[in-house]
Curated annotation (Swiss-Prot):
Active site: C98
Function: Catalyzes the covalent attachment of ubiquitin to other proteins. Acts as an essential factor of the anaphase promoting complex/cyclosome (APC/C), a cell cycle-regulated ubiquitin ligase that controls progression through mitosis. Acts by specifically elongating polyubiquitin chains initiated by the E2 enzyme vih/UbcH10 on APC/C substrates, enhancing the degradation of APC/C substrates by the proteasome and promoting mitotic exit.
PROSITE patterns: UBC_1 (PS00183), UBC_2 (PS50127)
SUPFAM superfamilies: UBC-like (SSF54495)
Ranges of compositional bias, category Basic and acidic residues: 171-194
GO biological process, one term: anaphase-promoting complex-dependent catabolic process
Organism of origin: Drosophila persimilis
Protein known as: Ubiquitin-conjugating enzyme E2 S
Lineage top rank: taxon: Eukaryota
Main EC class the enzyme belongs to: transferase
Pathway assignment: Protein modification; protein ubiquitination
Length: 209
């Protein structure tokens, strides 16, 4: 998914070079559980895949996120969005992410890697006091088991590898070789059957909520 509006022409050549350099470094040496998806024709369209951290309701998921750079970047922070549907206190219905790093704590030298790591940390430690999703924030504080079940259900429905179009962020490769393509059809059929069964189970769970 590419951005509808690009600010690439409004960024200075120095900023564009810096962003591309950082993205290429992350592609070569990715942070654990994070894979950047480089759009070389538009560096203002930054997307990445984040593995759901172990021990959280998001653990089985892979989440696609997007950063949108403004014309004043890096003096002003980018906006960050989850493109994958997620039940989380700090993620609005449109996917916008609320985190202090992208607001009052922003510093021009933080960089793209720091932002993505902060988003991953938000999956581990949500901040219900500054909730964009008030239902999720209230549920986390008052009925954590229900919150965890709801977040896990959303993860299992919306954040599976097939939804992102690739494998896990820690395993995904840029070069899908013949073996990958050969088995893609079979894998998709198995995943579709698994998802169909999972959706039926989740519908039954929702009726009881």
């Amino acid at each position: 998914m590419s951005s509808q509006y690009s600010n690439v022409e409004n960024l200075s050549p120095q900023t564009i070079r810096q962003v591309m350099r950082e993205l290429q470094e992350m592609e070569t040496t990715p942070p654990e559980g994070i894979k950047v998806l480089i759009n070389e024709s538009d560096v203002t369209d930054i997307q990445a895949l984040i593995d759901g951290p172990a021990g959280t309701p998001y653990a089985v998921g892979i989440f696609r996120v997007k950063l949108t750079l403004s014309k004043d970047f890096p003096q002003t922070p980018p906006k960050a969005y989850f493109l994958t549907k997620i039940f989380h206190p700090n993620v609005a219905g449109n996917g916008e992410i609320c985190v202090n790093t992208l607001k009052k704590d922003w510093k021009p030298d933080l960089g793209i890697k720091h932002i993505l790591l902060t988003i991953k940390c938000l999956l581990i430690v949500p901040n219900p006091e500054s909730a964009l999703n008030e239902e999720a924030g209230k549920m986390l504080l008052e009925r954590y088991d229900d919150y965890s079940q709801r977040a896990r259900m959303m993860t299992e429905i919306h954040a599976q590898p097939a939804k992102c179009g690739v494998g896990a962020a820690s395993d995904a490769k840029d070069d899908d070789g013949p073996s990958t393509k050969k088995h893609a059809g079979l894998d998709k059929k198995l995943q579709d059957k698994k998802k169909e069964k999972l959706l039926k189970e989740k519908k039954r769970m929702l009726k009881r909520l």
